Swiss-Prot record:
GO terms for molecular function: transferase activity; zinc ion binding. The keyword Zinc applies. Pathway: Protein modification; protein ubiquitination. Keywords: Coiled coil, Cytoplasm, Metal-binding, Transferase, Ubl conjugation pathway, Zinc, Zinc-finger. In early larva, observed mainly in pharyngeal and body wall muscle cells. E3 ubiquitin-protein ligase which catalyzes 'Lys-48'-linked polyubiquitination of ced-1, promoting its proteasomal degradation to maintain appropriate ced-1 levels for apoptotic cell clearance. Acts together with E2 ubiquitin-conjugating enzyme ubc-21. The coiled coil is required for interactions with ced-1, ced-6 and ubc-21. This is E3 ubiquitin-protein ligase trim-21. GO terms for biological process: protein ubiquitination.
């Protein structure tokens, strides 16, 4: 049987002297718990949520409403019956061989061949368990319960240990992640400095090589320009010599020739390209993954 409930809050009514779950009657005979009546109390009256009939509550005193004693008595009976049923469930069972007896003993004989280890006094004296060592069923189950309680405590202890270890591991994971971030930042800073240094070194070598190449190109271009001008002057000299060569004998004899005027341009130095040894560079040694 179940304890009756308040139809408003769905909580069990109580048979205790005081408390919000005591059943009290309204004027219309409907029953509510004190807690719900307190919530419904307004302007010194309670309007029944079922029939809407108002009930006056003098001086807001809910205790002035009559308790539903018949319901309280019923609650006490139900509570007592429930306790008896619980105790009865734990009573020793009837003996299978002798149903008129209670099987209050458990056979603990090591060589017992009977499948049913529960026995009564008759089983011990005249039945299948005659002369067998026995133990009270309640004593045996108490030992079981103590062992079960021990296992429960051990499991709870293991749960606590698991929680401690889990927390330690979670903390280690967080610390490891933090350390990783620090290490990664340090590594990036290190290689950033290397890249900056390499970039600076690369720019310096390129600028130095470019400047030397520019100087060599300027030198060679100046000599090329000079030789082009010299070629043009020689072409004019050839034209002048051809003109003189084609003169009549008398004119050529009278004019004569001025050899220094022509051959002064022939004594030129040999122009060689500028030396490119200064463009040889020595790159910093670095071990690449391909072995180069």
């Amino acid at each position: 049987m179940q304890v009756p409930k308040c139809e408003i809050c769905d909580d069990d009514f109580s048979s205790e002297e005081d408390g919000d779950h005591n059943p009290r009657n309204l004027k219309c005979s409907h029953t509510l718990c004190e807690g719900c009546i307190k919530k419904l109390l307004k302007n010194g009256r309670v309007v029944c949520p079922f029939c809407r009939e108002p009930t006056e509550v003098p001086v807001y005193n809910i205790k002035s409403l009559h308790k539903n004693f018949s319901l309280i008595q019923m609650i006490k009976i139900v509570t007592k019956t429930t306790e008896v049923e619980k105790n009865w469930d734990n009573f020793p069972p009837k003996c299978v061989e002798h149903p008129y007896n209670v099987a209050e003993f458990a056979c603990i004989e090591s060589n017992c061949s009977s499948k049913n280890k529960l026995m009564c006094q008759t089983c011990e004296e005249f039945g299948a368990h005659k002369g067998h060592a026995k133990e009270l069923l309640i004593t045996k189950t108490d030992k079981f319960r103590k062992k079960l309680e021990f296992w429960i405590n051990q499991l709870k202890l293991n749960i606590q240990n698991c929680t401690v270890k889990k927390n330690e591991l979670e903390e280690a994971v967080v610390k490891s992640e933090q350390l990783l971030n620090i290490k990664v930042k340090k590594i990036k800073n290190h290689f950033d400095k290397i890249r900056q240094s390499v970039d600076k070194k690369e720019k310096g070598i390129i600028d130095e090589t470019t400047a030397e190449a520019t100087r060599i190109q300027k030198f060679n271009n100046e000599k090329i320009t000079y030789l082009i001008d010299l070629q043009a002057r020689h072409v004019k000299d050839i034209e002048a010599i051809e003109k003189q060569k084609n003169m009549t004998d008398i004119d050529l004899y009278n004019t004569g020739i001025d050899l220094p005027c022509f051959f002064g341009h022939l004594n030129i130095e040999v122009f060689r390209p500028a030396d490119t040894k200064e463009m040889d560079i020595k790159l910093p040694n670095f071990k690449f993954e391909d072995g180069s």
